[in-house]
Amino acid sequence: MSAIVDIIAREILDSRGNPTVEADVLLESGVMGRAAVPSGASTGSREAIELRDGDAARYLGKGVLQAVENVNTEISETLIGLDAEEQAFIDRTLIELDGTENKSRLGANATLAVSMAIAKAAAEEAGLPLYRYFGGSGPMAMPVPMMNVINGGAHANNSLDIQECMIMPVSMTSFREALRCGAEIFHHLKKLTDKKGYPTTVGDEGGFAPNVGGTEEALNMIQDAIAAAGYEPGRDVLLALDCAASEFYKDGQYVLAGEGLTLSSEGFADYLATLADRFPIVSIEDGMAENDWAGWKTLTDKLGRRLQLVGDDLFVTNTRILEQGIDQGVANSILIKINQIGTLSETFAAVEMAKRAGYTAVISHRSGETEDSTIADIAVGLNAMQIKTGSLSRSDRISKYNQLLRIEEDLGDTVSYPGRRAFYNLRVR
């Protein structure tokens, strides 16, 4: 038995300078696991609740001392003495202890920090890499990265309505080569951005945030950077978008202020279809607002056979909502964000449900990150085959890529890089 003997939480800072929760879990053997929780900027209304203090005199109200206190008292007192290897039981205990549907009493930032730290301690106790502890001894695949190279929307202070324009290297035979491809494109994009007279400062997720004329200009710049780096758009590298459409959905209309357009759900679906016809786009995330289920159905019927349609704000890593989407034929993929639901067990259940339904699952960071790289191990351990963890700058993003490099080295010839096979439910061009 790997008995838990102590749990200690503290307030640390995330990549935006906002407080978040970090937890240490100590086992009887002396082994310790440590985990830190991320935080989002554009959030779904049905996400598990991130408990903030609301004291304007500290961190503009964003302090997490109450969440830390909840870990150091009630959670710690409940879990000390339990076996760290009983992850599912521990997570159920956390859920029952909180007693609310959205973890609003203890805070999902409190429960997740503990859930993750316990898993890390148990993996260390078992002498296993974290990805093996999650996934067992079977064959594993490295994830294809979604690399956010141009930021807009809530992640940048510019006129681009679409929140993220991303690249996905698919023709490579290893993650290492895919990462090199992405880095080379990123550096060529910086040169092109500078040449056009745009600032080369970066947004929350490490991508550039130029004040471009619209989505098409952003995508053309990315295609030019791909070509300048010696790769072929559509063959070596595919494109992906995160619309974060809930952010510009107003009174039943999609208001693209940067484009000067106001569109119905059908009109916005047509707009996205036109982009997909003009550019080698393979994936669109949150292409409709989270509450526009009719719009989501329209989009899925129109594009769901040829594009990955990812529900982020739509599903919020929640199996109950995902099940509704599966039943209604809405979207064909789910974005997995561990802090949207608040425990590892619930996160893993969402991935499993998606796979059983033929949906893909994309493991994701948040715009407010830390140096914690657990999502890299989750992506490999669960054979998710896709990861979204930002651009090729900022150490809070690079830490995940570097962990994936270590995992690939550790697995050697036994691991594959799926490339286009990551989109197993599509007719990928």
UniProtKB/Swiss-Prot annotation:
Q: Does the keyword Methyltransferase apply?
A: no
Pfam families reported for this sequence:
Enolase_C (PF00113), Enolase_N (PF03952)
The EC class name is lyase
Q: Which GO terms describe its cellular component?
A: cell surface; extracellular region; phosphopyruvate hydratase complex
What is the gene called?
eno
The chemistry this enzyme catalyses reads:
(2R)-2-phosphoglycerate = phosphoenolpyruvate + H2O
- Protein name listed in UniProt: Enolase
Q: Which organism is it from?
A: Aromatoleum aromaticum (strain DSM 19018 / LMG 30748 / EbN1)
Cofactor note as given = Binds a second Mg(2+) ion via substrate during catalysis.
Give the family from UniProt.
Belongs to the enolase family.
